[in-house]
Design a protein with these regions (language model features):
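Short beta->alpha transition motifs characteristic of CBS
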Residues: 30-35, 108-109, 130, 146-153, ...
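Gly/Ser-enriched beta-turn/beta-hairpin loop segments
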Residues: 2, 55-62, 110-122, 153-154, ...
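Short, acidic/hydrophobic/Gly-rich beta-strand patch recurrent on exposed beta strands
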Residues: 8-10, 41-43, 64-69, 105, ...
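A short, Trp-centered hydrophobic/proline-enriched beta-strand micro-motif
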Residues: 1-12, 17
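Catalytic nucleophile loop of clan PA
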Residues: 19, 128-148
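Short pre-catalytic strand/loop immediately N-terminal to key active-site residues, enriched for Gly-Thr
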Residues: 73-76, 122-129
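C-terminal cap/linker of serine protease catalytic domains
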Residues: 52, 144-178
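Conserved active-site neighborhood of the chymotrypsin/trypsin-like protease fold
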Residues: 13-17, 22-100, 117-118, 168, ...
Length: 178
């Protein structure tokens, strides 16, 4: 059932991934998926295309909060302070337009520094490709431990996800303003 809370996020010029974090339709994705602008739509697991409204962004952490109408199954954010290197994880996303693709791997490192200079990233060997951005990195209990954000080009198995505690703080700040 975890996969039912993952969505494809689409604009006129880009496609990425996202996930639902509340029953009333809040969706999290990476801001860079939306950055070129245009109307935002999401594709649900049951093949519905729904317009989405941008609620707010955290540019530093490359996060965006969207809102869609309806009632949804959603994913919970885990406590990323409890993560351990070597734990099994899965990524669900939309790599190269292949909707709802599932890949697996492990947590390779914690507290890695991202291109933004903050040490809030999980290193993983999960296969991440263009279109995976904004999708969840999930533990074996089906909870989100991170949002897939970037990979190191020219290297294999060097993917990075913003940790769930940072997501929670950012989303609470964004939603609290609206």
């Amino acid at each position: 059932d975890t996969i039912k809370s993952v969505v494809a996020v689409m604009t006129e010029s880009s496609v990425g991934s996202g996930f639902i974090v509340s029953s009333d339709g809040y969706v999290i994705t990476n801001y860079h998926v939306l950055q070129k602008g245009g109307p935002i739509r999401i594709l649900t697991y049951d093949k519905n295309v729904i317009p989405a409204t941008l609620i707010g962004i955290d540019n530093l952490r490359d996060l965006a909060v969207l809102k869609v109408r309806g009632d949804y199954d959603y994913l919970n954010l885990a406590d990323s302070d409890k993560l351990q290197v070597g734990r099994k994880v899965i990524a669900i996303g939309n790599p190269l337009g292949l909707s709802f693709t599932v890949t697996e791997g492990i947590i390779s490192g914690l507290d890695r520094e991202g291109p933004n200079g903050i040490q809030e990233y999980i290193q993983t060997d999960v296969s991440l490709n263009p279109g995976n951005s904004g999708g969840p990195l999930i533990d074996t209990q089906g909870q989100v431990i991170g949002i897939n954000n970037f990979k190191i080009g020219g290297a294999e198995s060097l993917g990075f996800a913003l940790e769930s505690n940072s997501i929670r703080d950012s989303v609470n700040a964004i939603v609290g303003k609206n």
